[in-house]
A protein has these predicted regions:
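Compact, glycine-rich, soluble single-domain proteins
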Residues: 1-112
Length: 112
């Protein structure tokens, strides 16, 4: 999704098969990000708030990154999102989609 279409009430959920150390960065954004590191049950394990934006892909070494954090899933939201500001460490997020999250993740990893 182009970053200019990324609304304050939206997020991007990155799902992984196992919990391990993650470092996130988002080149070519036009707004700062709040990045939520989640356990397998979607409990917020850690948060990186207000990660600075970086336009383009030039000079990858200059693109801001999170510190290394152990997590299974990662949620990115705009740092200026009122919803993101309400999410705190220890909070458990709830998956509301009609398909089970674990089954969705399993199917996605099988198709890769």
């Amino acid at each position: 999704m182009p970053s200019e279409n990324f609304k304050a009430d939206q997020g991007m959920l990155f799902c992984f098969a196992k919990e391990e150390i993650k470092v996130f960065w988002m080149p070519d954004t036009r707004f700062n990000l709040d990045i939520f590191f989640l356990g397998s049950d979607l409990t917020v394990l850690d948060i990186e708030r207000n990660l600075p934006f970086y336009r383009g892909f030039a000079n990858p070494q200059k693109i801001p990154r999170t510190r290394p954090i152990k997590a299974q899933h990662v949620l990115e939201m705009r740092a200026d999102s009122p919803l993101a500001k309400k999410i705190t460490k220890g909070m458990k997020l709830i998956w509301l989609h009609s398909k089970d999250l674990n089954q969705t993740i399993s199917n996605a990893h099988l198709s890769q």
